[in-house]
Amino acid sequence: MKKSFILVAILAVVSVGVAVAQPRAIGVNLGYGIDLSYQHSLGEANMIDLSVNIPEFHGIGATATYDWINPFNTAIPWNEKGEWNWSLGVGAGAGIYGFKQPFWYAGVVGHVGVEYNFWFPLQLSVDWRPNIGLTGIDDAFGFNTGGLYRTGFSLGVRYLF
């Protein structure tokens, strides 16, 4: 009986440690179309964000960013129950846009955001994800700068687990 109790106690401590060290989030970003987002923490201050993008509902793409998470001052009154963070990140993205005459795009993606993690498993965020890179249609190639201003801001809603 004593060995069983010790085993259960060790498993409980390890599972709590893993849950704290590896939080995850899944949800959507609404803005320039819709992004289905999965976030995986890499410690307290870093995370990987993987997204499937549906820009203006006229194509499909994917992005992956490595983000640095920075908490706001914890002494401020609005941090009483939840937690405010801001983040910066960089990554890559690619996709196809348009149906009648589709073109492809690929390039570097940036990420700037502010998020609020509630005391229950919900996160709200405001993000800007500019991208710049190459684009092509048929045999023509070009430089995509539209992603710097066209993608705009988005509102994110995620479930934390």
Identify the meaning behind each predicted range.
Residues 25, 87, 154:
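A residue-level signal for beta-strand positions that form part of recognition/binding surfaces
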Residues 23-39:
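Short N-terminal segments immediately surrounding and downstream of signal-peptide cleavage
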Residues 24-25, 34-35, 52-53, 59-60, 98-103, 111, 140-146, ...:
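Outer-membrane beta-barrel domain signature
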Residues 119-161:
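Predominantly the C-terminal beta-signal and adjacent terminal strand-loop region
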Residues 3-4, 30, 149:
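Short hydrophobic/aromatic segments of transmembrane alpha-helices and their interfaces
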Residues 42-122, 126, 158-159:
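Gram-negative (and chloroplast) outer-membrane scaffold detector with strong preference
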Residues 1-23:
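Cleavable N-terminal export/targeting peptides
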